[in-house]
Protein backbone atom coordinates (compact mmCIF):
# COMPACT_ATOMS: atom_id res chain seq x y z
CA UNK A 1 0.00 0.00 0.00
CA UNK A 2 1.53 3.28 -1.12
CA UNK A 3 1.60 6.26 1.25
CA UNK A 4 1.33 9.93 0.30
CA UNK A 5 4.39 12.15 0.60
CA UNK A 6 5.81 15.47 -0.60
CA UNK A 7 8.90 15.93 -2.72
CA UNK A 8 10.52 18.42 -5.07
CA UNK A 9 8.95 18.66 -8.52
CA UNK A 10 12.13 19.01 -10.57
CA UNK A 11 15.79 19.92 -10.45
CA UNK A 12 16.50 23.65 -10.15
CA UNK A 13 19.32 26.08 -9.44
CA UNK A 14 19.32 29.67 -8.17
CA UNK A 15 21.99 32.23 -7.30
CA UNK A 16 21.93 34.82 -4.50
CA UNK A 17 24.54 37.43 -3.57
CA UNK A 18 24.93 38.47 0.06
CA UNK A 19 27.63 41.05 0.93
CA UNK A 20 29.69 40.01 -2.11
CA UNK A 21 29.49 36.29 -1.28
CA UNK A 22 27.78 34.30 -4.03
CA UNK A 23 25.46 31.48 -2.94
CA UNK A 24 24.41 28.95 -5.58
CA UNK A 25 21.68 26.55 -4.44
CA UNK A 26 20.92 23.47 -6.49
CA UNK A 27 18.09 21.07 -5.60
CA UNK A 28 17.11 17.71 -7.05
CA UNK A 29 14.60 14.89 -6.39
CA UNK A 30 16.40 11.70 -5.33
CA UNK A 31 15.22 8.21 -4.42
CA UNK A 32 18.12 6.83 -2.36
CA UNK A 33 21.11 7.74 -0.23
CA UNK A 34 23.36 6.64 -3.10
CA UNK A 35 21.61 8.95 -5.57
CA UNK A 36 21.80 11.83 -3.10
CA UNK A 37 25.52 11.31 -2.50
CA UNK A 38 26.16 11.10 -6.25
CA UNK A 39 24.36 14.43 -6.69
CA UNK A 40 26.40 16.05 -3.91
CA UNK A 41 29.62 14.79 -5.48
CA UNK A 42 28.55 16.08 -8.89
CA UNK A 43 28.03 19.58 -7.49
CA UNK A 44 31.37 19.46 -5.69
CA UNK A 45 33.14 18.60 -8.93
CA UNK A 46 31.41 21.45 -10.77
CA UNK A 47 32.24 23.95 -8.01
CA UNK A 48 35.60 22.50 -6.98
CA UNK A 49 37.05 25.97 -6.43
CA UNK A 50 34.22 27.18 -4.18
CA UNK A 51 34.85 28.10 -0.56
CA UNK A 52 32.11 25.75 0.69
CA UNK A 53 29.71 23.19 -0.78
CA UNK A 54 27.03 22.61 1.87
CA UNK A 55 24.77 19.56 1.34
CA UNK A 56 21.55 18.42 2.99
CA UNK A 57 19.12 15.68 2.08
CA UNK A 58 16.20 13.64 3.39
CA UNK A 59 15.40 10.16 2.09
CA UNK A 60 12.33 8.05 2.88
CA UNK A 61 8.65 8.80 3.36
CA UNK A 62 9.15 8.79 7.13
CA UNK A 63 12.41 10.79 6.87
CA UNK A 64 14.44 7.67 7.70
CA UNK A 65 17.66 9.18 6.34
CA UNK A 66 18.63 12.77 7.15
CA UNK A 67 22.08 14.16 6.50
CA UNK A 68 23.74 17.55 6.34
CA UNK A 69 27.21 19.05 6.57
CA UNK A 70 28.49 22.55 7.34
CA UNK A 71 31.53 21.86 5.12
CA UNK A 72 33.81 24.08 7.17
CA UNK A 73 31.34 26.83 8.07
CA UNK A 74 30.75 27.44 11.81
CA UNK A 75 28.73 24.61 13.34
CA UNK A 76 24.98 24.98 12.85
CA UNK A 77 25.17 27.94 10.45
CA UNK A 78 24.97 26.20 7.07
CA UNK A 79 23.88 22.58 6.66
CA UNK A 80 21.23 22.61 9.37
CA UNK A 81 19.41 25.71 8.02
CA UNK A 82 19.35 24.04 4.58
CA UNK A 83 17.97 20.80 6.04
CA UNK A 84 15.35 22.74 8.01
CA UNK A 85 13.93 24.17 4.78
CA UNK A 86 13.13 20.63 3.61
CA UNK A 87 11.72 19.66 7.01
CA UNK A 88 9.60 22.80 7.36
CA UNK A 89 7.94 22.05 4.02
CA UNK A 90 7.65 18.30 4.80
CA UNK A 91 9.71 17.50 1.69
CA UNK A 92 11.44 14.11 1.43
CA UNK A 93 13.41 12.29 -1.27
CA UNK A 94 15.21 15.53 -2.07
CA UNK A 95 18.78 16.83 -1.90
CA UNK A 96 20.11 20.39 -1.84
CA UNK A 97 23.67 21.66 -2.16
CA UNK A 98 24.34 25.33 -1.43
CA UNK A 99 27.69 26.46 -2.82
CA UNK A 100 29.39 29.57 -1.44
CA UNK A 101 32.05 31.67 -3.12
CA UNK A 102 33.40 33.92 -0.36
CA UNK A 103 33.30 37.61 -1.22
CA UNK A 104 35.68 38.92 1.44
CA UNK A 105 33.11 40.13 3.98
CA UNK A 106 32.26 38.03 7.05
CA UNK A 107 28.51 37.48 7.50
CA UNK A 108 28.45 36.37 11.13
CA UNK A 109 26.46 33.42 12.45
CA UNK A 110 23.07 35.02 11.90
CA UNK A 111 23.99 36.19 8.43
CA UNK A 112 25.18 32.72 7.43
CA UNK A 113 22.00 31.08 8.71
CA UNK A 114 19.87 33.56 6.76
CA UNK A 115 21.96 33.24 3.60
CA UNK A 116 22.12 29.44 3.47
CA UNK A 117 18.50 29.01 4.52
CA UNK A 118 17.34 31.71 2.12
CA UNK A 119 19.19 30.18 -0.82
CA UNK A 120 17.75 26.74 -0.07
CA UNK A 121 14.25 28.20 0.29
CA UNK A 122 14.47 30.02 -3.04
CA UNK A 123 15.74 26.89 -4.78
CA UNK A 124 12.81 24.90 -3.40
CA UNK A 125 10.35 27.57 -4.47
CA UNK A 126 11.86 27.62 -7.97
CA UNK A 127 11.77 23.83 -8.30
CA UNK A 128 8.27 23.52 -6.86
CA UNK A 129 6.76 20.99 -4.47
CA UNK A 130 4.49 18.12 -5.45
CA UNK A 131 2.24 15.87 -3.40
CA UNK A 132 2.85 12.29 -4.47
CA UNK A 133 -0.61 10.77 -4.05
CA UNK A 134 -1.38 7.04 -4.44
CA UNK A 135 -3.50 6.44 -7.53
CA UNK A 136 -4.92 3.44 -9.38
CA UNK A 137 -4.27 2.68 -13.03
CA UNK A 138 -7.25 1.37 -15.00
CA UNK A 139 -8.05 0.48 -18.62
CA UNK A 140 -11.63 1.11 -19.80
CA UNK A 141 -12.62 -0.45 -23.13
CA UNK A 142 -15.83 0.55 -24.95
CA UNK A 143 -17.37 0.38 -28.42
CA UNK A 144 -16.72 3.24 -30.84
CA UNK A 145 -20.33 4.38 -30.60
CA UNK A 146 -19.76 5.28 -26.94
CA UNK A 147 -16.17 6.56 -27.28
CA UNK A 148 -16.95 10.24 -27.76
CA UNK A 149 -19.25 10.53 -24.78
CA UNK A 150 -16.94 8.53 -22.53
CA UNK A 151 -14.00 10.76 -23.45
CA UNK A 152 -16.04 13.91 -22.84
CA UNK A 153 -17.08 12.65 -19.41
CA UNK A 154 -13.49 11.81 -18.50
CA UNK A 155 -12.33 15.29 -19.50
CA UNK A 156 -15.21 17.11 -17.81
CA UNK A 157 -14.52 15.25 -14.55
CA UNK A 158 -10.77 16.01 -14.77
CA UNK A 159 -9.89 12.33 -14.75
CA UNK A 160 -6.18 11.88 -15.52
CA UNK A 161 -6.09 10.33 -19.01
CA UNK A 162 -2.71 8.76 -19.81
CA UNK A 163 -3.55 7.31 -23.22
CA UNK A 164 -6.15 6.17 -25.75
CA UNK A 165 -5.85 3.06 -27.94
CA UNK A 166 -7.93 2.71 -31.13
CA UNK A 167 -8.19 -0.96 -32.10
CA UNK A 168 -11.36 -3.03 -32.58
CA UNK A 169 -12.69 -1.03 -29.64
CA UNK A 170 -11.47 2.09 -27.84
CA UNK A 171 -9.44 1.73 -24.66
CA UNK A 172 -9.01 4.68 -22.31
CA UNK A 173 -6.09 4.40 -19.89
CA UNK A 174 -6.76 6.46 -16.79
CA UNK A 175 -5.15 7.22 -13.45
CA UNK A 176 -7.74 7.37 -10.67
CA UNK A 177 -7.47 9.19 -7.37
CA UNK A 178 -8.82 7.58 -4.18
CA UNK A 179 -12.62 7.61 -4.24
CA UNK A 180 -12.97 8.05 -8.02
CA UNK A 181 -13.15 4.41 -9.10
CA UNK A 182 -16.67 3.32 -8.16
CA UNK A 183 -18.42 6.50 -9.32
CA UNK A 184 -16.63 6.40 -12.67
CA UNK A 185 -17.30 2.70 -13.16
CA UNK A 186 -21.01 3.26 -12.52
CA UNK A 187 -21.07 6.15 -15.01
CA UNK A 188 -19.39 4.07 -17.75
CA UNK A 189 -21.85 1.28 -17.07
CA UNK A 190 -24.77 3.68 -17.59
CA UNK A 191 -23.32 5.22 -20.77
CA UNK A 192 -22.58 1.87 -22.41
CA UNK A 193 -25.52 -0.12 -21.04
CA UNK A 194 -22.93 -2.40 -19.44
CA UNK A 195 -21.13 -2.99 -22.77
CA UNK A 196 -17.63 -2.26 -21.49
CA UNK A 197 -14.63 -3.92 -19.91
CA UNK A 198 -12.70 -2.57 -16.96
CA UNK A 199 -9.21 -3.73 -16.03
CA UNK A 200 -7.52 -2.47 -12.89
CA UNK A 201 -3.78 -1.89 -13.12
CA UNK A 202 -0.98 -1.04 -10.74
CA UNK A 203 -1.09 1.31 -7.80
CA UNK A 204 1.22 4.20 -8.71
CA UNK A 205 1.93 7.77 -7.66
CA UNK A 206 0.36 10.86 -9.20
CA UNK A 207 2.15 14.19 -8.71
CA UNK A 208 -0.02 17.16 -7.66
CA UNK A 209 1.78 20.55 -7.58
CA UNK A 210 1.99 22.64 -4.41
CA UNK A 211 3.82 25.83 -3.50
CA UNK A 212 6.60 26.08 -0.94
CA UNK A 213 4.98 27.22 2.27
CA UNK A 214 7.85 28.14 4.62
Task: Enumerate the language-model features and the residues they cover.
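A common structural junction motif
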Residues: 47-50, 157-162, 189-197
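Short amphipathic alpha-helix segments
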Residues: 141-159
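C-terminal regulatory domains involved in ligand/effector binding and gene-expression control
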Residues: 1-76, 181, 197-214
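Short glycine-/aliphatic-rich beta-strand segments at the starts of folded cytosolic domains
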Residues: 128-146, 174
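Terminal, non-globular segments
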Residues: 174-183
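Interdomain boundary/hinge elements
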Residues: 53-55, 129-137, 164-169, 197-202
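Active-site beta-strand/loop microenvironment that shapes enzyme catalytic pockets
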Residues: 78-126
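Short amphipathic alpha-helices in soluble, non-transmembrane regions
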Residues: 150-155, 183-192
Amino acid sequence: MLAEYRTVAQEAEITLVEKKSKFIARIKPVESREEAEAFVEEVRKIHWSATHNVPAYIIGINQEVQKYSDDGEPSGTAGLPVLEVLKANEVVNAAIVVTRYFGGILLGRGGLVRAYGGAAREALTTAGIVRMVPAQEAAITVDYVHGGRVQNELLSRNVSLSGIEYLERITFRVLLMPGEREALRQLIQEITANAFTWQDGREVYRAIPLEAEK
